[in-house]
Amino acid sequence: MAPNATTKKRAAAKDDDFVLTLSDDENDVLENGVEEDTLSSSKKRKRDAAEAPKGKNKKQKQLKKSKKGESAAGAVSDDQSGEEDEAEAMDAGEDDGALDSEFEFDVGGNANTGVIEGFDGWEARNGAGPADAPKNGDKKAVDIDDIISRRKAKKEAELKKKQQKEKKRREEEGEEESEDEDADSDGGMSVDFQDDELLAADGFGMGADGADESGDDVENDSNDSDDADEKGSEDEESDDDAAASDNDSVATPVHHPDDEAASDEESEAESEVDAEEAEKRKAFFAPEEKSTAASTSNRSFQDFNLSRPILRGLASVNFTTPTPIQQKTIPVALLGKDIVGSAVTGSGKTAAFVVPILERLLFRPRKVPTSRVAILMPTRELAVQCYNVATKLATHTDITFCQLVGGFSLREQENILKKRPDVIIATPGRFIDHMRNSPSFTVDTLEILVLDEADRMLEDGFADELNEILTTIPQSRQTMLFSATMTDSVDKLIRVGLNRPVRLMVDSKKNTSMNLTQEFVRLRPGREDKRLGYLLYLCNEIYTGRVIVFFRQKREAHRVRIVFGLLGLKAAELHGSMSQEQRIKSVENFREGKVAFLLATDLASRGLDIKGVETVINYEAPQSHEIYLHRVGRTARAGRSGRACTIAAEPDRKIVKSAVKAGKAQGAKIVSRVVDPAVADEWAAKAKGLEDEIEEVLQEEKLEKQMAQAEMQVTKGENMIKHEAEIMSRPKRTWFETERDKRAARKLGATELNGPSKKDKVKLSNKDKKRLDDARQRHEGNIGWKKGKADREAPKQGKNKGSKNKSDKKNNIKMKGKK
């Protein structure tokens, strides 16, 4: 007992000698901490308050380190806070993973923001993850607008300098010459006025023609919209004009002989296939329930018996009434059945499969984190959009998400995969990359597989990648396939491994939205080269904002982007040659209204949901009617109205015919837009006058890309020197295909979108390259031409004698050799 008493006395003496010195700020911190401790009554408040004293204790420790003996006091406070944290952790463990009704998980960061008005899947991303900031290393994007603005500034400076010189020269001439000569100099200035008058007259004529044309178009549209079902009356009205023979409708009732022959062949082929295919479908698909059709009318999300967090998530994005595809899909998906679903574009197919997935995941075991769902998309933009929609709907749950798409950091995605997120949203290529090369990613636990835009995923371009995924993931899974143009081919669907799937075809006839007006502008034979003039007229005079223009080729989209920039039209481009950061920036700029036109390839034709798209213009008709439906489906979504305008030439006759036929059967509005050929020729001439400047911009862009590539190579070399050991220790990433197989797959994918190429591209030999280079140099410089036949037959007299002597000598040498 004596030693204990002595130690207590010593400790008391030390405490008496120790004097606490606290500043005014630290007193305030302590008082606030006491008030927060008294307010924490529930478990949630205790958890929130537990983090605040920790931070304040750390701050106190940093401020007290300079004082003697303060470390001991800091240690005591840390021990006390540690004991409180352990006690709270034990209290939290008593729930055994159950959800508290008062507890709110805020994964997306918008739990308390209320209803999100006009949510379109491209809202600002608040949650952490790869969607926030794409990691592309040190790649520098080349901005076309910067190049064009620099060139304009340079031209303006040169013009200003030239004008100053001209003004100075005129002033000098005015001092030296007489008044008559001054009058002559004024006459010389009239040339500039004439030039200005020419420009003004040109602009005035254009404005007058455009106004008249727009008025005619409005009248034509109104007449056509009133009589959309009877196209013949439109043609009779247009015949009254003098130029009606050149500008009549594409949807003319006079059938082309090739069209009639093709339709007969197609009908015979369809009748033969239908019988066999019907038997296959009857054996493959599960029988449809007839009772569901009557019960799906006037239902709400509450009728599906969804959990409260899911209903709150739906209300937060202003989803109140389920669409027809959602009414059919959600009850069947909750039962765990395989689904093949189809509906028109903009009908809510994403929510149709996300909602039942979230509902099923709410009842998952929580002790061990496990990835249970994989959603595969054909494009990066669609995957990013689906990720945003899913995180918004799951705001009030504890379900975690991960997106695996190209263009983002592999390391960050691997770190997220280590946490085993519940739902993985990916493109096939990056999914296979992580499946083969990320040790923390396992697919053995997947229970649900979703293929969005499934008909595109089943095409030849994705066939090898899809087979690699399907043979790796478990066979005992729920599989759901969705698309606006879903295929019924049993042979293709068998590859996915479906087990008696349920067909949910809300739109089995591949129709467009009823609020969509389809327009067609016909190019007569021989006017295909004026296509750009028609596009510029439409974008300058008719459709001036919120327009998506679709192209078949990336090269054409990029070139038209430069033309738009030179003509002062604000536009952005979207295609596969851009980096992921550029692609997301283009979509965001268009969504926010910073640019009026989005020039895109078929990369953006599927699934992209941007609010307020008023018009879709097809620069060329697509390869198939299915692609046409996806393109025009970017507008007139979710009950809104929109227009689709297609510039069609003779090669596009088949697609236009099928679109008009489907539209008439549906009762959709089909309009023929008449454009004055003279106006289109003027715009085409303007575009042709910019060809030299376009080539200069392309050359400057090429040089900037080469500079950026060189800088990247230098940075790569520096990193190899600095971090050689770490880089060489990494395992080499593998792929299931060779480079030759990759090229073949890309070729098949291009063929699906653009049709077979007219001639196969073959790598040129060095001899062929040299021959082509020589021909190009001769053509450009008019040098190095060989003598023609006339020059060889009529040479000069002196050269003729010399040639005879040389020939005689050669003959003599030959004769001597024979002797």
Curated annotation (Swiss-Prot):
Motif (DEAD box): 452-455
GO molecular function, one term: RNA helicase activity
Acidic residues bias locations: 23-38, 80-105, 173-185, 210-243, 260-277
Cited InterPro entries: DEAD/DEAH_box_helicase_dom, DEAD_box_RNA_helicase, Helicase_ATP-bd, Helicase_C-like, P-loop_NTPase, RNA-helicase_DEAD-box_CS, RNA_helicase_DEAD_Q_motif
GO cellular component entries: cytosol; nucleolus; preribosome, large subunit precursor
E.C. number(s) listed in UniProt: 3.6.4.13
Catalytic activity: ATP + H2O = ADP + phosphate + H(+)
Disulfide bonds: none
Ranges of residues in domain Helicase ATP-binding: 330-504
Family classification: Belongs to the DEAD box helicase family. DDX27/DRS1 subfamily.
Cited function: ATP-binding RNA helicase involved in ribosome assembly.
Name of this chain's protein: ATP-dependent RNA helicase drs1
The organism of origin for this protein: Neosartorya fischeri (strain ATCC 1020 / DSM 3700 / CBS 544.65 / FGSC A1164 / JCM 1740 / NRRL 181 / WB 181) (Aspergillus fischerianus)
